[in-house]
Amino acid sequence: MSLISAVPLASSCVSKSLISSVREHKALRRAIATLQMSRPGKSVAASTRMSSATAGCDDGVKRRIGDYHSNLWDDNFIQSLSSPYGASSYGDHADRLIGEVKEIFNSFSIADGELTSPVSDLLQQLWMVDNVERLGIDRHFQTEIKVALDNVYRYWSEKGIGCGRDSASTDLNTTALGFRIFRLHGYTVSSDAFEHFKDQMGQFTASANDTELQTRSVFNLFRASLIAFPEEKVLEEAEKFAAAYLKAALQTLPVSGLSREIKYVFDYRWHSNLPRLEARSYIDILADNTISGTPDANTKKLLELAKLEFNIFHSLQQKELQCLWRWWKEWGCPELTFIRHRYVEFYTLVSGIDMVPEHATFRLSFVKTCHLITILDDMYDTFGTIDELRLFTAAVKRWDPSATECLPEYMKGVYMVLYETVNEMAKEAQKSQGRDTLGYVRQALEDYIGSYLKEAEWIATGYVPTFQEYFENGKLSSGHRIATLQPILTLSIPFPHHILQEIDFPSKFNDYACSILRLRGDTRCYKADSARGEEASCTSCYMKENLGSTQEDALNHINGMIEDLIKKLNWEFLRPDNNAPISSKKHAFNISRGLHHFYNYRDGYSVASNETKDLVIKTVLEPVLM
C-alpha cells in the first residue's frame, strides 16, 4: 500500500457489537463509510515518500531541534488492544437500561404534564438531568431532558426556584443547579436571582453549621459561577465566596463522594473539562458511594448504564485508535524524527469531548488535522530553515503536487501528506454539507502557515514584536481555527455560510477561542520556547513593554485576560440572540475546552508523559469495573 494513502476506517474495523444499540449501529456504519478517504492502489512519486533518509534530513545544515520526548505508545501495544465489550449482548443490555431510565424520567410527570410530588419534585428532575449529563449518557435522553426542563422552568422566578412546586421559598441548591442547567440548555435565566441569597450587607454567607446540604449548595453555586457572562458581578462574587468556602470545607470534610466532586471541579473547571473524564470520575464516585452507603434504585440504574456505555465506547475507541495507527504508520509519519508524535493523545482529547459513535468521521478528522498541525508546527518552529519555509509557504498557496519540485526532500513528503489528507477530508465534508468547503479550509491553512512564517522570520532576524503584534499573529498560529474548522465540517450538522460566519474567522467566537489558546499556551510554554531561541511570547513581550515588571506580573496580567476571555466565549456560545444555535457551536466550543485541558497544568501536548498519559489510560485504555 502506498505510503501516502490514508487507511480507511472501513466497516470491517468496527463491528455491530461495538455500538451501544442496534439503532446506532446502522447510523455508525454510514458514518464509517465516509471515512474511506483513499483507495488501495493510490500512489505518488517515490520522491514524496517519507523515509529515514529524508525525514531526518542529514544534509549538514545547522538546524534547531525541539528535543521532545518520543512517542509513548509502542506499536505492538496499540495493535494488541482488545475489549470484550464489543459483543452484541452488551449493546442489547444497554438498550434495555436506556428504556428503564426513560421510565424514571417519565415517572416524574403524569400524562397532563403536572408533577406528581410537590415537595422536592423540581430538584429531583434537575438531579436526573445533571446526573445523566455528568455520567456521559445524556444523548439517549434528549426528549426526556427537554420535557423535564420545560416543566421545571415554569416555576423559575426572578428569585430563583425552590425544591418543589409547593415550596414556600426558593433555596440556593436548587436555584444554583437550575441556573447552570437552564443556561447551558439555552433557557433565559438571570444571575440576579443570586442577589436574593445575600445577607443584609450584600454578602454571600453560610451558617456556622457546615451541613452536607449547605456544602452541596455552595458547590452548585461554584459550578454555576463558572459559566458567567461578562459583567455579571454577582457571579464573580459567588465564585470567590464559593471557592473560599469549599477550600476550607475540604480541610475538614472526610474523604467522600462530595469531597471528590469538589476536588474534580477545582482541578477541571468548566472551560477545561472533558466530558468523558468527568464521566469516568463521576462513575467512580457513585460506585464508591454504592459500596459505602445505601443508594436508591434510580442511582443504581444510572450507574449501571453509565458503566456499560463507557465500556462499549471504550471498545470502539480501541478500533478507531488502531485505524489511526495504520494511517499514521503507512504515511511514513514515524520517520519524521523531528516532530512530536501525539496521535494517541489527540485521539484521547477528541474522544473525550465527543462520545457519539456515529461521529467517527469527526474524531478521526480531528486527529489527522492535529497531527498535520504538529508536523507544520515543529517544521516551522525549529527544523526548517527560513529559506525552506518560504518555499513551503509558497507551495501551499499554489496547492498543486507539482509545487513539490522546488522543495527539499523531507518537505516533499510533508507537503503531499498535507495536500492529500486535506483534500480527502474536504470530500467528506462535501458529502456532509452538500457543498464544496475546501476554499474555507485552504484559506484557514494559508493564514495558519503565514503566521508561522512570520514567527520564523522574527526568530531569524532577532526581532521582538510588541505585545499586541505578537498576540494578533499568535491567535492564528495557535492552530485553533484550522483544528476546529476541518473536523466540524464533516459532521452531519449543517453549516451554511451564515452559521459558519458565527463560528469561524472573523467571528468573535473564533477570536476568543484562539486568544484563550494562545495565552494559556504561552503561560505554559514560554520557558521551553525561550530555551529554543524563541524570544517572542506574550510573557516576554509584556515585560519588554512594561519595564520593571516581573514574570509574575506578566503571568497575572495574562491570566486576567484569560478569565475575561472565558466569560466572553461563554456568552458567544450560549447567547440567546445568536444566529447560530448552541448545537452548531457545541463541537467548536468543546474543542476549545479540550485544547485548554492540555495546558491545564503544563504543556501537556509536548510533555505528554505526566497528566496527559494518565488521561489516556483513564479514558481510552482502561475500562471501568462493572
Curated annotation (Swiss-Prot):
It is an enzyme of class 4 (lyase). Gene3D superfamilies: Farnesyl Diphosphate Synthase, Terpene synthase, N-terminal domain. A motif (DDXXD motif) lies at residues 377-381. Binds 3 Mg(2+) or Mn(2+) ions per subunit. One of its GO terms (cellular component) is chloroplast. Mg(2+) 1 binds at D377, D381. One of its GO terms (molecular function) is magnesium ion binding. InterPro entries: Isoprenoid_synthase_dom_sf, Terpene_cyclase-like_1_C, Terpene_cyclase_plant_C1, Terpene_synth_N, Terpene_synth_N_sf, Terpene_synthase-like, Terpene_synthase_metal-bd, Terpenoid_cyclase/PrenylTrfase. This is (+)-3-carene synthase 1, chloroplastic. It comes from Pinus banksiana.
